[in-house]
Amino acid sequence: MSKLYEWIIPESDVLDKEEVQVKPPAMYKVVLNNDDYTPMDFVIEVLQKFFSMDMEKATQLMLNVHYEGKAICGTFTAEVAETKVAQVMMHARENEHPLLCTMEKA
């Protein structure tokens, strides 16, 4: 008969546990920029649809864009920020608005 614990790896074959430092991902701000042509209602719609804002928050941010020239819609990882910018830009173009959405390193 074979021994029950024959399969145990000799201690000399075990690797030491290595400490791994995990950095948080780089974050990016998604920014809406003001223009003189995109209707305010459309900007509110964009903020509700793509950034899950309620009417009050979307209206406040739209006013910030209007009066300050731009406003941050949120901060996300690079991939999420890129996707949100692309979605907003595509939606604006489909509706024939020149709304500009960009991303900046946070």
Swiss-Prot record:
Encoding gene per record: clpS
Lineage: superkingdom: Bacteria
Function: Involved in the modulation of the specificity of the ClpAP-mediated ATP-dependent protein degradation.
GO BP annotation list: protein catabolic process; proteolysis
UniProt record similarity statement: Belongs to the ClpS family.
Source species taxonomy: Bacteria, Pseudomonadati, Pseudomonadota, Gammaproteobacteria, Vibrionales
Organism field: Photobacterium profundum (strain SS9)
Pfam families xref list: ClpS
Binding partners and assembly: Binds to the N-terminal domain of the chaperone ClpA.
InterPro entries per record: ClpS (IPR022935), ClpS_core (IPR003769), Ribosomal_bL12_C/ClpS-like (IPR014719)
Protein name, per record: ATP-dependent Clp protease adapter protein ClpS
